[in-house]
């Protein structure tokens, strides 16, 4: 598949129920559970599925699959803000108990994150 095609259609093969060719935007915060036990299993990560949009939803899943395909990666992660992206990057690159060296001229909240939260 050409890069341009991946950018437009990657991560979504069309909806067999509606025939939609483009991925829909799911404007919901919560998802239905089959039962209380099913909801508990979702939140305990015992089964796959959607539980709350801030964690994951079908719209962001398509975006993540599309970005991974464009970049030739195994996966991708979308987050709600640049600060969240900074946090994830620091947590995944820095070793526990180590040091993070940064300039005090960073965005103030990033500096606070580095000095107070990620220690």
Residue map of PLM features:
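N-terminal glycine-rich, Lys/His-bearing helix-loop that initiates the first secondary-structure elements
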Residues: 1-47
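Conserved N-terminal alpha-helix of the aminotransferase class I/II PLP-enzyme fold
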Residues: 35-84, 109-115
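Alpha-helix C-terminal capping segments
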Residues: 69-70, 88-96
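Structural motif
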Residues: 24-25, 75-78, 98-99
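Fold-independent oxyanion-binding glycine-rich loops
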Residues: 11, 29-30, 81-82, 90, ...
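Conserved PLP-anchoring active-site segment centered on the Schiff-base-forming lysine
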Residues: 92-110
